[in-house]
């Protein structure tokens, strides 16, 4: 039987690893980002029956969202270098009854398919690429003529402050920024989407930006910040960054929530920048 997909593996550049805690963090983050990614997909013109490729699919959140939008007559392929995280994605799709998703262990640059896709999408992908222009070209070759290429990226260096000022929130956010500055391959990816698309020989992308904001006790931002710092702890250790004698990870999510609510503060997550182009 002829294989529908061909792939070779190469070394991963994902900075956060795929520990059980990190996979759980990805799932929580996926729920928080879902409305923004859905707006991107709808702006692109996602429709029933489409064939979609999800780059660096991780735990499968974007793949499952796309599968819901294209319906059972469509098809989704999610690729990732980590078989461990793909096993999680496969189980989640099975539990959700989304049988029109296929997950393939593959690197983006080596992946190929017998038929092109109506849409190729990636979320938080370009920030991990040392050669983002090459990745865009590789992704574009998988899109059918008239199809679309779309990316949802995070502006990592964006202000994630609190107003009024909450020292614990701001200190945690600064630690995360410091860790990412030394670990991400393409820290300014969200600021350079027009440049990257242009250098790849692609049409100028359509763009929009949204920012996550919270302040109430039920905001998902507390858990997101605490879990992200936990995943980055090995990187902080390698950088020999010591948070300080008074800083501890124990109960950080609850302490962030208590501090923000007590101060009646408004907290900000990083800007989410989305770009897409029809090819």
Regions found by a protein language model. Give the residues of each.
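A short acidic, Gly/Pro-enriched loop at the edge of an enzyme's catalytic core
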Residues: 111-119
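Conserved alpha-helix/loop element of class I SAM-dependent methyltransferases that forms part
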Residues: 31-51, 65
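C-terminal helical/coil "lid" or tail adjacent to the Rossmann-like core of SAM-dependent
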Residues: 15, 21-22, 206-267
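A short glycine-rich, Lys/Arg-flanked "PGG" loop and its adjoining helix->strand segment in the class I
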Residues: 133-148
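Conserved catalytic/acceptor-binding region of the Class I
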Residues: 150-219, 238
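N-terminal, positively charged/glycine-rich alpha-helical extensions of SAM-dependent methyltransferases
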Residues: 1-23, 27-28
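A short SAM/SAH-binding and catalytic strip from SAM-dependent methyltransferases
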Residues: 118-133
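Class I SAM-dependent methyltransferase SAM/SAH-binding core
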Residues: 53-55, 59-110
């Amino acid at each position: 039987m002829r294989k529908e997909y061909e792939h070779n593996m190469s070394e991963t550049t994902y900075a956060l690893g795929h520990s059980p805690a990190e996979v759980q963090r990805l799932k929580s983050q996926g729920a928080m980002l879902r409305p923004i990614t859905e707006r991107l997909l709808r702006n692109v013109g996602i429709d029933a029956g489409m064939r979609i490729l999800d780059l660096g699919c991780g735990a499968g959140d974007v793949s499952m969202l796309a599968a819901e939008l294209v319906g059972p007559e469509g098809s989704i392929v999610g690729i990732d270098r980590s078989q461990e995280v793909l096993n999680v994605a496969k189980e989640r799709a099975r539990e959700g009854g989304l049988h029109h998703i296929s997950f393939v262990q593959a690197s983006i640059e080596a992946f190929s398919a017998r038929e092109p896709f109506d849409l190729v999408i990636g979320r938080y992908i370009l920030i991990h690429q040392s050669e983002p222009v090459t990745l865009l070209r590789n992704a574009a070759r998988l899109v059918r003529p008239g199809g679309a290429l779309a990316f949802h990226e995070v502006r990592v260096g964006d202000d994630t402050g609190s107003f009024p000022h909450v020292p614990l929130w701001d200190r945690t956010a600064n630690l995360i920024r410091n860790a990412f500055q030394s670990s991400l391959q393409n820290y300014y990816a969200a600021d350079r989407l027009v440049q990257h698309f242009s250098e790849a020989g692609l049409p100028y992308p359509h763009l929009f930006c949204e920012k996550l904001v919270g302040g109430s006790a039920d905001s998902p931002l507390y858990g997101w910040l605490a879990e992200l710092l936990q995943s980055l702890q090995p990187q902080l250790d390698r950088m020999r960054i010591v948070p300080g004698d008074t800083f501890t990870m124990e109960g950080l999510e609850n302490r962030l929530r208590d501090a923000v609510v007590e101060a009646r503060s408004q907290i900000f997550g990083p800007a989410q920048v989305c770009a897409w182009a029809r090819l």
